[in-house]
Amino acid sequence: MTDLYRFLPEEMEKLVIDMGYPRYRADQILLPLYYKFPKNISDIKQLPKTLIAELIESGYTIGSAKETHRIVSEDGDTTKLLLNLTNNESVETVLMQYDPSKIGGHPRSTICVSTQIGCAMGCTFCATGQMGFETNLKAEHIISQVIHFEEIIEQRKEHITNLVFMGMGEPMANYDEMIRAVKILTDPRGFGLGQRHITISTIGIKAGIERLAEENLQIGLAISLHAPNNELRKKLVPTATSDSVEEIIEAGHNYFKKTGRRVTFEYALMDGINDSREIANELAELLRGNGSHVNLIPINPTAGDFKRPSKSRVFEFKRILSEAGVNCTIRIEKGTEISAACGQLRTDTIG
């Protein structure tokens, strides 16, 4: 069975032409896929019955995620879903909605998608990392997470405005499927989301960052750094062996030079581990003057022993970076109480 959500628009054109139908039939498939959310090929009423029958007989299908659990934060701004995918795997996906009265600008509806079940990176402070790696998700499974939430919020006359690859898994370790999903989701004949509204997060796989820089895309890049030196980073990210902190930062800077997109370095602050003044100064020295941005994330509760620093310690860390000329913010917290925040996703339970 081949999911129609897997096809790039040009591939959909080739499919219908190879089946003996005119090119425009591709758009008659693509438009309802991304705006009407059909569950079966037979639901696409614009298509001739002969094409519908041939697609079904040839093993094509429309794969839609099935929601098995839902939990919503107390303020109603964050929704976490456990979705059953067409490969019978379950994955967590999160919707975060931002009120402009709180953040300024326009309202935002951001989807946090997963690219893997579990993760092989083994970050000691991350619930997903402690699951271990199970499997990569196909592009259509990534897309189905987006489609499922779009269908939900469209009922409220809202639409997805932003997409972050910050859910379960390391996107760069599933590069081909991840980038296929990105290209489909940003194609005007696909989901049509603007490239600048997408951010890909990585633990710092240099080869993946370099490859992404060559894609000629305006995708945002977030690098999970968490430490200013290799000794500490190795303790927090056991798989961080081949690429040094300096090499990762250089790869991020090269991405900025290639794409013009400012790189964000994510830094999870852990009490007594990586939050001292000395470490803040070391980080400032590394990042000063390279045009990057640091997003400080007070560690979210997981099953591990790591604790969140005091607010005064967090603000002191930020002050040191800012006074050194490093652009820095503290992440707006979303979904912590429903285990939907950074580092909290896993599939064994949902609230």
Where are these regions (language model features)?
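Residue-level structural signal for beta-strand termini and adjacent loop
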Residues: 95-96, 177
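Short linear Ser/Thr-Pro motifs
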Residues: 73, 114-115, 201, 224, ...
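Conserved AdoMet/S-adenosylmethionine-binding subsite of the radical SAM
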Residues: 150-329
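A short, flexible beta-alpha/helix-coil linker loop
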Residues: 36, 100-101, 129-133, 229-230, ...
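Canonical Radical SAM [4Fe-4S] cluster-binding loop centered on the CxxxCxxC motif
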Residues: 97-144
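Auxiliary Fe-S-binding modules of radical SAM enzymes
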Residues: 1-91, 97, 253-262, 267-351
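Generic beta-strand structural signal
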Residues: 79, 91, 108-113, 121, ...
